[in-house]
């Protein structure tokens, strides 16, 4: 409940500041939630790099409160109330505030949890560690696998829970709040065009479902996950929509820099998305200017270049910070198992695109990428060709609704610029599939829809925004209504999930809850400096990753291969989880590590482990390993934590904690 009260108070503080700032600078209040939230994230980022993350949270709260104080002094309470009233009449602002409050209330009641593997390896683990430790996860010695994630989603989460205990549902609500702020910028229309604003907001909200390969009737996690896909799509599209609304004003133009910096800090690929955003803005400043293109070019180049510098600064600062606090080989900027630099990958990829030294793998992936654009489902209408066709129809309507001259050039430049950058991004992913994935994953185009759907979403959102802002008001409103109606109709026809953010999903959390209950018992004994080896016989990695996320300790990686004799480590390799077996031809488990009692003890000593957690045992552990453990082992034993007394102890593993559970 405290999380909810704090979040609602912060929303009230933020929206009040937006209303006052809108009054001061004569801007639409719907435009300001995105730059204000982004500004808060930037402040937290700078303070986090300096090692004072919670000080940054206090600074953000004081800054928002200061806006209220200045507003009350300058405009008097009656003036602030009038500013609130005017802000509430703007559809984008009201929908943002109401939608965000609804999400927080709903999630507080439903308590949704993480469900996807990547949330437990990085995207959910990282914000959890930031909230619990009050510092960036890369500066923390625990669970450093989260260090490859970028900090934006962790920081927006921390903004909404900087002082209290960690809550997964609050993380999910915070990310959705950022997404709604992006939609508010896209739907920032005056009161008299409220219908257009509502339609753009509603259509934009459905876009993550529209550009989705989720099977019909399944659970839709678009607004209930901590992955960076939703923030990436919304920030990319929302930043451009913000620019389309304020870009011609000298001071307000630089508001775009704040969400652009946050976009860059969202994911590694967002460096490319940030540069694409700067390019599209520069293209608009050049081709859609009121003055001749030749005269507009230098100014457009300078402004776009300045935004590109911001992107580069944000991207490089995170890389330098990560390298400084974790000076290991894993933090180097490299691609694939060969450790090639980004430059080498790009040069090699371009050469192969041009036919120079093209490998068979590259040729096969290139053919698969070409076919996937037409055949691989990326939206509710089908493949990428259908997505581009739908977006082009909206762009054509926006062009018709715009005035002749610069407004029409703006729509044309934006759409063609998006198309050009999409082609470049598509080729870039072709190169990544060749260099950054195994042969099997590359040829299968692993996560193809996840990588490209955010671009389609942002492209469509930008075109909807331009359509709603069309000067021919009646035509624009009718066309926007038609586009929103089509999106809604297709969603109802082919994409309505069986469950989503609006419904509970308790059946998805059964295994999570089981591991969580067991981990709670272990955490009464464990502390962050402790190192724990987790064994769960028959696991497919799911339970191991859950424990790695839940335990308040350092979970030690296991091994794969053969380690059946002391001193013979040449046939084993580093892994994460492991199933212990007695021979390499063991067929009971798909993932196995040959291990005997002596080598288990040796491995514990080698990895400096303090504890071993036997989550699930089997006949092999009961038969061969029981003498090592106090009280022995049984194949039906509850999850049990043992303290490692050392390799020379008569009984190396002594009882530390026992957890009961009815779920297996």
Regions found by a protein language model. Give the residues of each.
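Membrane-embedded, hydrophobic transmembrane alpha-helices
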Residues: 1-87
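Membrane-interface alpha helices of multi-pass inner-membrane proteins
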Residues: 43-48, 240, 252-268, 272-279
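Active-site lumenal/periplasmic loops and adjacent helix-entry segments of GT-C-fold
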Residues: 102-199
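Membrane-lumen/periplasm interface segments of specific transmembrane helices
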Residues: 111-114, 156, 287, 297-397
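Signature aromatic-anchored transmembrane alpha helix within multi-pass, membrane-resident enzymes
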Residues: 251-260, 297-311, 467-498
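Membrane-embedded, lumen/periplasm-facing catalytic core of multi-pass transferases
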Residues: 326, 485-546, 664
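Short periplasmic/luminal acceptor-recognition loop of GT-C membrane glycosyltransferases, typified by
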Residues: 522-572, 615-618
């Amino acid at each position: 409940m405290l999380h909810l009260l704090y979040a609602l108070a912060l929303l009230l503080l933020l929206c009040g500041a937006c209303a006052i700032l809108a009054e001061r600078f004569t801007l639409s209040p719907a435009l300001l939630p995105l730059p204000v939230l982004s500004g808060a994230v930037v402040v937290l980022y700078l303070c986090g790099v300096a090692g004072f993350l919670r000080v940054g949270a206090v600074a953000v709260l004081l800054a928002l409160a200061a806006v209220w104080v200045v507003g009350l002094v300058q405009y008097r309470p009656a003036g602030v109330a009038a500013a609130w009233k005017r802000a509430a009449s703007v559809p984008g602002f009201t929908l943002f505030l109401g939608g965000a409050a609804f999400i927080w209330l709903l999630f507080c009641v439903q308590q949704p949890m993480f469900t996807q593997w990547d949330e437990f390896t990085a995207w959910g683990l990282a914000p959890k560690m930031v909230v619990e430790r009050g510092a960036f996860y890369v500066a923390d010695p625990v669970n450093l696998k989260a260090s490859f994630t970028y900090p934006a989603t962790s920081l927006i989460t921390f903004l909404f829970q900087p002082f209290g205990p960690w809550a997964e549902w609050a993380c999910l609500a915070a990310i959705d709040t950022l997404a709604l702020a992006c939609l508010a910028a896209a739907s920032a229309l005056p009161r008299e065009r409220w219908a257009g604003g509502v339609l753009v907001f509603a259509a934009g909200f459905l876009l993550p479902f529209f550009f989705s390969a989720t099977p019909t009737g399944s659970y839709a996690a678009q607004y209930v996950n901590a992955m960076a896909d939703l923030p990436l799509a919304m920030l990319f599209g929302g930043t451009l929509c913000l620019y389309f609304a304020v870009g011609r004003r000298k001071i307000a133009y630089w508001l775009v820099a704040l969400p652009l910096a946050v976009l860059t800090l969202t994911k590694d690929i967002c460096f490319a998305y940030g540069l694409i955003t700067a390019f599209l803005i520069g293209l608009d400043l050049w081709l859609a200017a009121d003055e001749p293109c030749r005269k507009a070019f230098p100014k457009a180049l300078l402004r776009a270049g300045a935004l590109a510098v911001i992107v580069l600064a944000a991207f490089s600062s995170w890389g330098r910070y990560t390298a400084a606090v974790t000076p290991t080989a894993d933090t180097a900027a490299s691609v694939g198992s060969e450790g090639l630099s980004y430059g080498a990958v790009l040069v090699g990829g371009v050469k192969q695109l041009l036919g120079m030294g093209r490998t068979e793998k590259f040729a096969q992936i290139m053919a698969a990428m070409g076919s996937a654009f037409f055949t691989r489902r990326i939206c509710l209408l089908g493949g990428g060709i259908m997505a581009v066709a739908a977006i082009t129809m909206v762009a054509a309507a926006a062009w018709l609704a715009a005035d002749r001259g610069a407004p029409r050039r703006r729509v044309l430049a934006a759409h063609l610029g998006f198309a050009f950058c999409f082609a470049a991004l598509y080729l870039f992913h072709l190169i990544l599939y060749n260099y950054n994935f195994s042969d099997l994953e590359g040829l299968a185009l692993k996560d193809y829809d996840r990588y490209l759907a955010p671009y389609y979403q942002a492209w469509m959102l930008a075109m909807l925004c331009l359509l709603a802002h069309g000067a021919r008001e009646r035509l624009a409103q009718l066309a926007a209504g038609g586009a929103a109606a089509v999106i809604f109709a297709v969603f109802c026809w082919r994409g309505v999930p069986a469950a989503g953010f609006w419904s509970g999903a308790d059946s998805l959390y059964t295994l999570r809850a089981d591991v969580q209950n067991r981990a709670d018992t272990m955490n009464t004994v464990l502390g962050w400096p402790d190192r724990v080896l987790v064994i769960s016989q028959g696991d497919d990695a799911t339970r191991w990753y859950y424990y790695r996320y839940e335990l308040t300790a350092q979970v030690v990686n296991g091994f794969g291969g053969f380690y059946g004799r002391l001193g013979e480590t040449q046939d084993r390799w580093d892994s994460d989880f492991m199933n212990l077996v007695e021979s390499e031809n063991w067929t009971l488990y798909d993932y196995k590590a040959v291990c005997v009692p002596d080598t288990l003890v040796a491995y514990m000593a080698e990895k400096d482990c303090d504890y071993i957690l036997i989550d699930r045992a089997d006949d092999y552990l009961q038969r061969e390993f029981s003498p090592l453990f106090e009280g022995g082992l049984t194949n039906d034993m509850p999850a049990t934590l043992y303290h490692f007394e050392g390799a020379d102890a008569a009984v190396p593993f002594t009882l530390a904690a026992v957890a009961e559970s009815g779920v297996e």
